[in-house]
Amino acid sequence: MESIDRSFTIRADVGFCSSHEDFMCLHFAAADFPEEALSTPRWKHDVFLSFRGEDTRKGFISHLHHELDYWQAIKTFKDNRDLERGTSISPELLCAIEESQLAIIVLSPNYASSTWCLDELTKVVECMEARDTILPIFYGVDPSQVRNQTGSFAEAFTEHKEKLITKKKVEQWKADLTKVANLCGWDSKNF
């Protein structure tokens, strides 16, 4: 059993299953709620979800969020806004990352085309890398595409360079994607 600082336990039987409706859902089994954990939580959110809305919001993310939130035991932050292109990441979102115990990064074909997602990723790596609390999910992309920035990830970075985003920022995003892609995670082709 793996313990979370909020003093409840997530059992090791975490995994994906296919239901009779043929969708994927993540099952977490939560238990053991000491009273002090409920009164003085260390983290505002147990999980921060980072995802590209156009790829996953109405399908995979909605099911994942539902499963995480089902027992009201795992407090999950999910940004519900559809963002306009070029919008900067909000201070509230940066704060939500800082106040989260764990981040689930859902890397999908268009993830890297969003500067917002990449800025989120940089903040997640900054806050959580040392604690080993980042879980990547490779949704419709091979981990090697993310790690090496090939395919749609290469195309996205070509577009970012054409938009005159600083070389330093682009290199930071690439380094962060590589770090996250090298972590143990889940690949949707194995669900």
Q: Which residues are covered by each model-predicted region?
A:
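Cross-kingdom TIR/SEFIR domain
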Residues: 66-70, 89-190
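Conserved N-terminal substructure of TIR/SEFIR domains
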Residues: 1-102, 127
